[in-house]
């Protein structure tokens, strides 16, 4: 698996994550067949500093996440986890600290051939 860092910006929020690819093993026509296959994207962090105006418009919140890989029983594809840190907005004028309880797990869905949140 290859996890390529990605980042973007939309509506005053910068975000970061990974685009996920797997290498196609076995015989193939490299002219017609993809050597790498896209299997999804995951978000690992965001920052609303450009939209929050120092907390005057909305609470400022920044989070980042650590990407982890683990073997998954019954699958050749690893289980992915994103363990966040930082803060998130929970309501008007409110934020809270993120921790291990906020960890998000992603598993490969063979039907869609993409990673999905579990």
Locations of regions flagged by a protein language model:
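Extracellular-facing segments of soluble proteins and assemblies that are Gly/Ser/Thr-biased and enriched
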Residues: 1-16
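Acidic, small-residue rich beta-repeat scaffolds with periodic aromatic anchors
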Residues: 17, 22-118
């Amino acid at each position: 698996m290859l996890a390529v860092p990605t980042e973007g910006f939309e509506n005053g929020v910068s975000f970061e994550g990974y685009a996920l690819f797997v290498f196609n093993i076995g015989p193939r026509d490299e002219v017609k067949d993809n050597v790498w296959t896209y299997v999804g994207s995951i978000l690992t962090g965001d920052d609303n500093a450009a939209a929050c105006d120092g907390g005057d418009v909305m609470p400022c919140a920044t989070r980042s996440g650590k990407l982890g890989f683990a073997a998954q029983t019954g699958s050749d594809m690893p289980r992915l986890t994103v363990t966040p840190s930082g803060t998130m907005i929970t309501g008007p004028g409110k934020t809270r600290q993120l921790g291990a309880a906020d960890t998000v797990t992603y598993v490969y869905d063979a039907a869609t051939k993409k990673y999905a949140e579990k």
